[in-house]
């Protein structure tokens, strides 16, 4: 049944879901399934396999909750066959909790107290709605704890109110109406005007619950968490209460007065707060999911940023008072030299710094400069460009997360004898060479490409970001003989322990000559090898296929292709025209389908190639260094640094990034900023607004005003 529910929810064929679930339960990873098991999944891509896994996890969790509910009700002796069937047939968490509510262990409530005082029979009489002498009946319930008939009736109404609040139909009716027509409203907490000025847009704001945007709701939530705002759900209480009256108060009821009072109290005191909490939690989850989706997509783009490649680099972590930390790196990213120069105020040793940088570039045959884009970054870039070093590229590199890495255990382990400034400069240089290999060492949340990342569900955020890192690492593949344990950790089927074992084995035994040698690594068994091998590359090894995305389990197919063509595997790999003549369907059999054969041929064409784009040179406007240099209407080059649901932030070479609102991204309607821009994209923007008080810069990419 689980697979059928998933297929229905995702709109994917049952056979595809069944194949995917079987592989997931067998311990296969998402990258492995989507890349090497297309016959089993009907060629589902990574996102679809991930969606199946997410639904499977949710339904597994729901199944566990159902067992808890069944057990609890069973212990109360109230589990009927009909109730068991209803619970077992339930596949929605909200519905399950509604069924469970009347049986759920409670704290002491007004209704609990009323029952303890023996008022349940009176409540039953009122709910029967056919007795005209309730006031006289109530006198029989007068005791020391219930001194008057009025108090007896009030207690009985408390019991009725709780029953109404636990009625599935009633809760569903209120939930549907409030979700469809309700609005989320934020208002200022009295006396917080100055403290909460940044939330001024939300001091008295209302948005339809169905359509409130992720960033707007999360901003409200953050304001609430900081004690500046209060949030509530506005709903038509009178109309909803009237609907409940129609459900519970019969026409011609003899106890109408008390029933209507109990229903109104039930809605105001019990149902509304409960449904309001539920709806706000659902809105929070929806907003979290959208914010996490945006963060994950930004992270994916950043991790797959174009690498400069294995080049000799001079990296600079700029600064004013503390100077610029300079490091020289070889083409493998190893630290060769470090020093500090002081070209900027207050020291102003410009000529000395220029000579030092020129000398280092010559001594270490530098092919590029990597300059951090933080404090003093533009000034340092100007200095380096002014050196006039022919054939040496100059690149600005994002510093986001570099300070986190430099103070981390990973950095201390690699550079125990150097301080955080040296480690930070090394990270900047390596990030230019290969962003992916360097960024995997940093907690993804510290990279700075999120939207309200500290306000969303942290466990869900971390799980999603880890999935993205795994996806990117396995998409690119890694060289088994140069990869750090940090990047190996994310390879399909490995994890930290096996990554450390691989690095230790490599250090003790030298480079791996082929993929099969991985099986000699301690604790790396057949299952881990199956999951990992296709994503690990052996460059210049014994078997040329080891430097491709072809899985070892499919080598025999390539060998057949070569044999059929009358050539060796090496000759087949070297001759693109020969490969063009291969007919994939000839190699399809009961074990291997057309998708796998097609992927094999594609992998042979791309053997040894990096799937990432080529790095492009870029420079900011040399006349713009601060907000004071900006004028409305001026056109500037920029780099997209962050993408949100409401637009894109662009670095224009000053301390503060500008915002291109979604409405200003193009001369047409834009549904999502990601449809128009990507991280690191070089764009041309026009300044449309400068707010020096709130430190905001408005930009536009529209050509027609």
Place the predicted regions along the sequence by residue:
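C-terminal accessory/binding modules appended to enzymatic or scaffolding proteins
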Residues: 11-12, 306-308, 470-504, 622-660, ...
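Accessory alpha-helical DNA-binding modules that contact the DNA backbone or grooves
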Residues: 29-30, 45-147, 475-614, 621, ...
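Duplex nucleic acid-engaging cores and interfaces of nucleic-acid transaction enzymes
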Residues: 45-51, 58, 62-72, 76-315, ...
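Long, charge-rich intrinsically disordered scaffolds of nucleic-acid metabolism proteins
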Residues: 95, 395, 401, 406-476, ...
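Low-complexity, acidic/Ser/Thr- and charged residue-rich accessory regions of DNA metabolism proteins
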Residues: 141-149, 205, 244-267, 271, ...
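A glycine-rich phosphate-binding loop feature that marks nucleotide/adenosyl-phosphate handling sites
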Residues: 176-182, 316-320, 374-379, 397-404, ...
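Long, charged amphipathic helices and adjacent flexible linkers at domain junctions
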Residues: 278-296, 411, 446-477, 586-632
């Amino acid at each position: 049944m689980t697979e059928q529910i998933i297929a229905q929810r995702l709109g994917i064929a049952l056979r595809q879901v069944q194949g995917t679930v079987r592989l997931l339960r067998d311990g296969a990873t998402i990258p492995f399934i989507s890349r090497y098991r297309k016959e089993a999944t009907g060629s589902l891509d990574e996102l679809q396999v991930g969606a199946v896994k997410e639904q499977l996890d949710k339904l597994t969790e729901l199944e566990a909750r159902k067992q808890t509910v069944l057990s609890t009700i069973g212990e109360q002796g109230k589990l009927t066959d009909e109730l068991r069937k209803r619970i077992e047939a339930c596949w929605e968490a909200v519905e399950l909790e509604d069924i469970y509510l009347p049986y759920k262990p409670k704290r002491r409530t007004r209704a609990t107290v009323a029952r303890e005082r023996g008022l349940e029979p009176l409540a039953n009489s009122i709910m029967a709605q056919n007795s005209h002498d309730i006031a006289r009946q109530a006198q029989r319930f007068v005791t020391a704890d219930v001194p008057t008939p009025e108090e007896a009736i009030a207690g009985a109404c408390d019991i009725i109110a709780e029953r109404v609040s636990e009625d599935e139909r009633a809760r569903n009716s209120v939930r549907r109406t409030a979700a469809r027509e309700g609005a989320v409203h934020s208002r200022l907490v009295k006396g917080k005007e100055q403290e909460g000025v940044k939330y001024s847009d939300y001091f008295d704001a209302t948005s339809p619950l169905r359509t409130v945007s992720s960033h707007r709701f999360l901003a409200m939530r953050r304001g609430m968490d900081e004690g500046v705002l209060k949030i509530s759900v506005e709903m038509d209480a009178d109309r909803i209460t009237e609907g409940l009256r129609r459900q519970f108060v019969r026409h011609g009821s003899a106890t109408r007065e008390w029933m209507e009072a109990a229903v109104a109290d039930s809605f105001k005191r019990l149902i509304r707060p409960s449904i309001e909490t539920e709806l706000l939690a659902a809105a929070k989850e929806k907003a979290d999911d959208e914010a996490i989706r945006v963060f994950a997509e930004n992270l994916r783009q950043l991790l797959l940023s174009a690498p400069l490649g294995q080049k000799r680099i001079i990296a600079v972590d700029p600064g004013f008072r503390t100077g610029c930390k300079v490091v020289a790196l070889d083409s493998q990213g190893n630290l060769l030299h470090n020093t500090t120069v002081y070209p900027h105020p207050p020291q102003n040793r410009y000529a000395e710094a220029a000579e030092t940088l020129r000398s280092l570039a010559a001594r270490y045959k530098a092919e590029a400069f990597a300059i951090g884009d933080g404090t003093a970054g533009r000034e340092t870039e100007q200095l380096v460009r002014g050196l006039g070093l022919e054939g040496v590229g100059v690149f600005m590199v994002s510093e986001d997360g570099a300070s986190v890495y430099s103070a981390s255990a990973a950095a201390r382990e690699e550079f125990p004898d150097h301080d955080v400034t040296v480690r930070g400069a090394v990270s900047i240089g390596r990030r230019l060479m290969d962003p992916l290999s360097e960024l995997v060492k940093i907690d993804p949340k510290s990279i700075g490409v999120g939207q309200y990342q500290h306000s969303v569900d942290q466990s869900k955020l971390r799980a999603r970001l880890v999935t993205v890192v795994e996806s990117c690492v396995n998409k690119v593949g890694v060289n088994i003989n140069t990869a750090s344990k940090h990047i190996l950790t994310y390879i399909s089927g490995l994890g930290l322990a096996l990554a450390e074992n691989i690095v230790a084995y490599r250090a003790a035994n030298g480079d791996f000559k082929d993929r099969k040698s991985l099986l000699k690594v301690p604790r790396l068994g057949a299952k881990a090898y199956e999951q990992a091998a296709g994503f690990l590359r052996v460059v210049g090894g014994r078997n040329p296929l080891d430097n491709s995305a072809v899985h070892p389990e499919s080598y025999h197919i390539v060998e057949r292709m070569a044999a059929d063509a009358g050539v060796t595997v090496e000759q087949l790999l070297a001759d693109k025209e020969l490969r063009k003549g291969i007919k994939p369907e000839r190699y399809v059999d009961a074990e291997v389908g057309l998708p796998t054969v097609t992927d094999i041929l594609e992998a042979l064409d791309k053997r040894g190639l990096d799937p990432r784009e080529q790095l492009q040179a870029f420079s900011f406007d040399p006349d713009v260094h601060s907000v004071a240099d900006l004028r409305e209407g001026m056109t500037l080059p920029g780099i997209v640094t962050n993408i949100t649901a409401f637009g894109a932030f662009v670095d224009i070479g000053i301390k503060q990034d500008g915002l291109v609102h979604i409405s200003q991204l193009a001369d047409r309607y834009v549904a999502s900023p990601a449809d128009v821009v990507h991280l690191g994209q070089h764009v041309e923007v026009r300044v449309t607004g400068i707010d020096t008080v709130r430190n905001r810069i408005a930009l536009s990419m529209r050509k027609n005003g």
